[in-house]
């Protein structure tokens, strides 16, 4: 009997964890700016939303998908000066035509093939389910480089069961602010500082999703530094 109860507890614990109120030590955590982090649970977030349907935007890498396998392969195949999971490398930054060719080749493969190795984040699945139940319209906006073709949209449609999903908006390293304004977003989810800053610039409520500690994107994140709410247990 004890063994059966223990197994049941171990099975249910991850589910229960997502619905626990924010712990005291989390509410007193300090952002890099010295201010307290505004932690929010999934349940609290849902209760804070307006009753009528809204338009929401998800970032892709490290927010909706754990896509590090593709970027890790790309770095090994093409070199770290060409492939990065962050936003620092642009085609015009590369010195040689060969490096620029490799750059475009990687992004073509990333957007058409390598997401077969990406894994949806559990928190993203929970968020998408919540927004679908509310009747909200969901968009995905990414700073990935667009090279003329992509299967990312179809991957996201299948992964999150969104058959009516509009094509992913690729900004090719440019700011997401115009895209947020164009779709008239009310809420956005992102893991990077750029996601948060550009959401604020567009007048959109930003929610910080924690980046996995095993992500190959090592660009610093200053969670809570912009006054944004940070989603509890969103690393997974």
Residue ranges: model-predicted function:
Residues 2, 22-60, 225-236:
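Non-catalytic pre-domain segments flanking phosphatase-related domains
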Residues 55-58, 65, 138-142, 167-169, ...:
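Structural recognition of the beta-strand scaffold that forms the well-ordered cores
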Residues 84, 97-100, 104-139, 146-150:
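Short, acidic loop-to-helix structural element flanking the phosphoryl-transfer center
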Residues 2-10:
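Bacterial N-terminal signal peptides that target proteins for export
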Residues 43-116:
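Active-site neighborhood of HAD-like aspartate-dependent phosphohydrolases
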Residues 10-19:
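Bacterial N-terminal signal peptides
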Residues 185-236:
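Acidic, Mg2+-coordinating phosphoryl-transfer loop and its flanking beta/alpha structural elements
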Residues 145-197:
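Substrate-recognition "cap/lid" segment bordering the active-site pocket of phosphatases
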């Amino acid at each position: 009997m004890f063994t059966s109860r223990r197994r049941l507890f171990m099975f249910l614990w991850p589910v229960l964890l997502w619905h626990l109120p924010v712990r005291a030590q989390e509410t007193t955590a300090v952002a890099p700016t010295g201010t307290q982090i505004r932690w929010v649970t999934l349940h609290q977030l849902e209760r804070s939303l307006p009753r009528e349907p809204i338009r929401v935007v998800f970032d892709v890498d490290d927010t909706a998908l754990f896509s590090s396998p593709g970027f890790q392969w790309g770095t090994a195949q093409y070199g770290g000066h060409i492939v990065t999971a962050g936003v620092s490398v642009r085609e015009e930054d590369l010195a040689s035509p060969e490096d620029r060719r490799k750059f475009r080749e990687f992004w073509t493969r990333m957007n058409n093939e390598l997401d077969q190795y990406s894994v949806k984040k559990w928190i993203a699945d929970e968020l998408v389910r919540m927004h679908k139940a509310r009747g909200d319209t969901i968009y995905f906006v990414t700073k990935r480089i667009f090279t003329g073709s992509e299967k990312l949209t179809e991957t996201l449609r299948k992964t999150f069961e969104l058959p009516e999903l509009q094509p992913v908006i690729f900004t090719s390293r440019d700011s997401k602010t115009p895209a947020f304004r164009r779709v008239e977003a009310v809420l956005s989810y992102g893991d990077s500082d750029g996601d948060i800053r550009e959401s604020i610039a567009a007048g959109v409520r930003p929610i910080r999703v924690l980046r996995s500690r095993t992500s190959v994107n090592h660009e610093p994140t200053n969670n809570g530094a912009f006054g944004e709410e940070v989603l509890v247990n969103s690393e997974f």
